[in-house]
């Protein structure tokens, strides 16, 4: 089911919708999937110089799952005896002791529910000509509950229940300032941009398992059972703070220059290395606008471009790697199991820093014969240093691995794309396109150790891929 409403005035625009979806399971009665969602979008112009908008959505899902694998149902023999003389499910479907999947499903229950809420808000402020401030914010929340139980008749042992609950909360705040510098000579155009953002990602979960439920109840009565082991608890959080400044200059709309620098700070790194600075620059030349090509009618576009930039990577490191992790271990003391903690097998490294990749790019964009033939030729060369990889350690130290900034790699390649309209009429267009790529990856150095031949020493067996 789907309903949608739209309306508004010159200054206010509203769109709202609701959806409901219900799908029954294919095999077992009672299994299925349900989803209910709402959506609301609003654009409001308060005045000519200020406006804002909201995009929001909410979704609630419920999934009832059957026990076992789907193959257990479709691979059972069609001659299997699934009912007894009283019309109830048999426990076994043959004399070999194979359980009846329908019997198991009858004594098993699992329900997974999720609530998702997403809100995006923006505001544009233009107090004077050429100046624009934009605020972007977004919030995402998800809560989920995964509960299952096996009653006392479940084959192989029942009277158990499991409950896992989790919550995810992400939010982003972004401030963007753009200023088109007024220049009397219209041949010149200069635009300045500044960006500041804060990105937060967090999640937490907890889970319980019990046995010996006194009565055949579901996971909502989990407190009546005997806990098996300790509750499972997880917590993850990371923050990224960024600043960026950019200048875009154009001369005659023919010579284009873009210079930028950004500074990122990540909570994943140690105190001394949280921040990284990453500059970039790009230049483009519209050759077809030069006087010596302006009268060449078959050239629609011919642009040469070159760029160089450095980007940082933090994805190779966990949220708490630099702090040092501990593993929980149970031990028996006084005939009672206690929970203790031991250092992780991975040695912490507070000196980890951003992995950096520097890329030089040269390209040509072209379009000929009124757009009937167009394509791109591009060459790139990337050097990556301070790779975030695990270093093997001597087990006698009490640790087996340590994440470290090791080595350098180099990659280069050529990308070609060509598209053409073989046939172009008012009623019919036939377009052909082709792409070609050639690249090479090379390990320049894995660490600072060289062998007797002056080549990078060892650790290739750790999982590195060597390019041709």
Which sequence ranges carry the predicted segments?
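Immediate N-terminus of the mature polypeptide
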Residues: 65-67, 87, 112
């Amino acid at each position: 089911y789907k309903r949608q409403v739209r309306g508004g005035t010159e200054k206010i625009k509203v769109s709202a919708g609701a959806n409901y979806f219900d799908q029954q399971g294919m095999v077992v009665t009672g299994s299925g999937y349900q989803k209910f969602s709402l959506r609301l979008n609003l654009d409001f112009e308060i005045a000519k110089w200020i406006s804002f908008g909201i995009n929001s959505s909410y979704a609630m899902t419920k999934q009832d799952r059957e026990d076992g694998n789907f193959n257990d149902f479709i691979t059972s023999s069609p001659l299997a005896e699934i009912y007894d003389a009283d019309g109830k499910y048999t426990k076994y479907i043959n004399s070999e002791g194979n359980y009846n999947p329908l019997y198991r499903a009858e004594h098993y229950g699992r329900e997974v529910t999720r609530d998702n809420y997403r809100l995006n808000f923006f505001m544009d402020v233009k107090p004077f000509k050429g100046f624009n401030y934009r605020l972007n914010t977004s919030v995402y929340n998800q809560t989920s509950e995964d509960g299952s139980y096996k009653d006392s008749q479940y084959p192989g042992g029942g009277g158990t229940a499991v409950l896992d609950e989790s919550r995810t909360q992400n939010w982003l705040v972004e401030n963007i300032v753009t200023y088109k510098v007024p220049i009397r000579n219209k041949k010149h155009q200069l635009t300045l941009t500044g960006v500041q953002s804060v990105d937060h990602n967090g999640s937490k979960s907890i889970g319980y398992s019990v046995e010996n439920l006194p009565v055949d109840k579901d996971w909502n009565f989990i407190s009546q059972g005997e806990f098996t082991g300790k509750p499972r608890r997880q917590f993850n959080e990371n923050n990224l703070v960024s600043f960026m400044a950019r200048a875009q200059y154009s001369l005659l709309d023919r010579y284009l220059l873009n210079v930028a620098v950004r500074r990122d700070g990540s909570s994943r790194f140690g105190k001394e290395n949280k921040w990284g600075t990453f500059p970039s620059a790009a230049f483009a030349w519209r050759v077809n606008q030069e006087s010596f090509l302006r009268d060449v009618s078959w050239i629609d576009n011919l642009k040469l471009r070159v760029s160089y930039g450095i980007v940082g990577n933090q994805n190779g490191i966990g949220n708490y790697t630099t702090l040092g992790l501990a593993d929980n271990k149970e031990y028996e003391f006084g005939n009672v199991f206690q929970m203790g903690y031991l250092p992780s097998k991975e040695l912490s490294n507070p000196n980890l820093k951003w992995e950096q990749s520097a890329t030089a790019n040269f390209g040509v964009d072209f379009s000929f014969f009124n757009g009937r033939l167009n394509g791109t030729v591009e060459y790139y060369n990337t050097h990556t240093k301070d790779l975030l990889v695990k270093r093997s350690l001597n087990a006698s130290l009490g640790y087996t691995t340590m994440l470290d900034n090791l080595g350098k790699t180099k990659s280069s390649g050529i990308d070609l794309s060509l598209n053409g309209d073989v046939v172009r009429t008012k009623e019919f267009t036939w377009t052909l396109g082709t792409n070609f790529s050639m690249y090479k990856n090379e390990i320049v150095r894995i660490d600072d150790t060289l062998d007797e031949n002056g080549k990078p020493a060892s650790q290739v067996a750790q999982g590195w891929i060597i390019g041709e």
